[in-house]
Amino acid sequence: MMEDKIIHTPRFDEQRRMRRKKRQRLQLFIFLSIVAIVSLILIYMFTSISYVKKISVNDTSINSTKTIKEKSGIQSNMRIYSLDTKQIVSNIEYLDGVKSVTVRRHFPNTVSINVEEYDVLGVVKDGEHYHPALENGQILHKHNYAEPSEVPLINNFSSKALNQLVKVLRASDTAIINQISEINFIPKVEASHRVQFYMKNGLEVIGDMRTIDNKLNYFPAMASKLKKDSNGRILKPGIIDLEIGAVFIPYESKQAEERRIELEAAMEERSEKDKAELEKSVEKLKKELNQVKKNS
């Protein structure tokens, strides 16, 4: 058998050398790239670059940024890649008024915390202090608000009645809630679910807690039909009675005066009842303390 012969020309040999060099350069580039990437990762992981440098928190109305940062448990000597985000979320969720929490890490050393709080529907007065009442029916007694201006002042509501009020406010338009300055719960024997709203435009709304959520949205239409001066103020303020139907009673009328006397009497009766219940609780506590002293 005749052996095949391969003839190598100078041009062919040169092309082989060029391909070999190109392959070697590519291999060297890949190797150096891997070394560089590994070096950067090691530098990032084991130097101060990966320590938490910044914690950003969104604006909140109940809990301060300082409180949220402290509750998160994040320290400046912690490395960002080792943070337990689930634990951070759990820590912050224990704060009053917190609805949900999201924690994200951002290269190289920033942590962002987004806290969603329950809406503040009103404030409850306790002596000289005002405490926020939330959309979930909770009253935050540990938190003090300044005298209310943007949210209504809520008076004389029991826990059960407050939960009913929350449902009413959540079902109402935000524009209407923003017009309310004060809400009073003034039940009587013949009207055990009566509620009174003082509006910022000088009007007063009376209704039944069980049906007011379907009627309160009528308020803007009724108010718009009343005569106003050049500055937009209502010329003849009065009562919008939504207990049975939807009737406007000017304050100057005899019917409004009778209604006013009835409502004031109901509020006074409610205050006396609350006072009596408080005195009864204090007396009970005194008896329990005396009994403890005797036993000791």
UniProtKB/Swiss-Prot annotation:
Regions of this protein lying in the Cytoplasmic compartment: 1-25
Primary gene name: divIB
Domain named POTRA: residues: 50-118
UniProt keyword annotations, A-Z: Cell cycle, Cell division, Cell membrane, Membrane, Transmembrane, Transmembrane helix
Main location: membrane
Location in the cell: Cell membrane
Gene Ontology terms: biological process: FtsZ-dependent cytokinesis
Membrane topology listed for this record: Single-pass type II membrane protein
Protein name: Cell division protein DivIB
Assigned protein family: Belongs to the FtsQ/DivIB family. DivIB subfamily.
Record function comment: Cell division protein that may be involved in stabilizing or promoting the assembly of the division complex.
Transmembrane residue ranges: 26-46
Gene Ontology CC: one annotated term: plasma membrane
Sequence ranges on the Extracellular membrane side: 47-296
